[in-house]
């Protein structure tokens, strides 16, 4: 069932007009050479679509397409040493992992010090049970605006967009040994979330510090 984005709508519009990119990199003593095995969790994705130039509505079709495009481009990139993909069949556990990824992105966006962000319990437990130290978490969200126009919820004044939407992505690598984050990168891009080129650009940006 479709639901209107509430506070999320305001956040997304604000992000759209913010800088196109933000990046960090390695945030612990771990280096690229230390990461020989990396387990990738299912990415968290959440997209909306502007309907009738008035509201951003949750849209499963946009979400699924954007998720598939990002995953395909990330797999083609080959920068990260992903050695396994973690598939979770238990819906309760899967939902917990998705929620933990979502909250980690919220902490990062709200400038919570990285040293104060610990690996979430469900993700940590899964990595430990597989005897894998490092886990890859991916977040992707935003909205699609097919008409290129959005009407402000308060005034109804049309706001023209130069692009057909916005994507907000993050790549986070966590360490189950020391229970912390080792790599954090975020990217906000004013671009169509239904085009593969959007994610080629975004992944290049997200991993530029990893490649150094």
Model-predicted regions and their roles:
Residues 1-4:
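Positively charged n-region of N-terminal signal peptides that target proteins for export
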Residues 6-11:
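Sec-dependent N-terminal signal peptides
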Residues 20-49, 125-134, 139-212:
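C-terminal/domain-edge helix-coil "capping" segments
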Residues 52-137, 184-186:
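N-terminal segment of the mature soluble domain
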């Amino acid at each position: 069932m479709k639901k209107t984005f509430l506070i999320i709508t305001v956040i997304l519009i604000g992000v759209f007009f913010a800088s196109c990119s933000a990046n960090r990199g390695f945030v612990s003593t771990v280096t690229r050479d230390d990461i020989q095995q990396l387990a990738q969790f299912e990415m968290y994705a959440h997209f909306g679509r502007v309907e009738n130039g008035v509201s951003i509505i949750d849209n499963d079709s946009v979400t699924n397409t954007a998720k598939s495009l990002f995953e395909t481009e990330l797999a083609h990139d080959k920068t990260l040493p992903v050695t396994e993909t973690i598939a979770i069949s238990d819906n309760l556990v899967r939902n917990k992992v998705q929620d933990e990824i979502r909250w980690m992105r919220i902490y990062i966006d709200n400038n919570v010090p990285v040293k104060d962000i610990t690996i979430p319990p469900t993700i940590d437990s899964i990595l430990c049970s597989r005897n894998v130290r490092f886990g890859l978490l991916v977040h992707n969200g935003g909205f699609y605006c097919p008409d290129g126009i959005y009407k402000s919820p308060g005034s109804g004044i049309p706001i023209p967009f130069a692009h057909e939407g916005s994507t907000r992505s993050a790549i986070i690598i966590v360490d189950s040994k020391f229970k912390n984050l080792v790599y954090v990168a975020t990217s906000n891009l004013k671009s169509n979330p239904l085009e593969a080129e959007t994610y080629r650009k975004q992944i290049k940006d997200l991993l530029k510090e990893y490649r150094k």
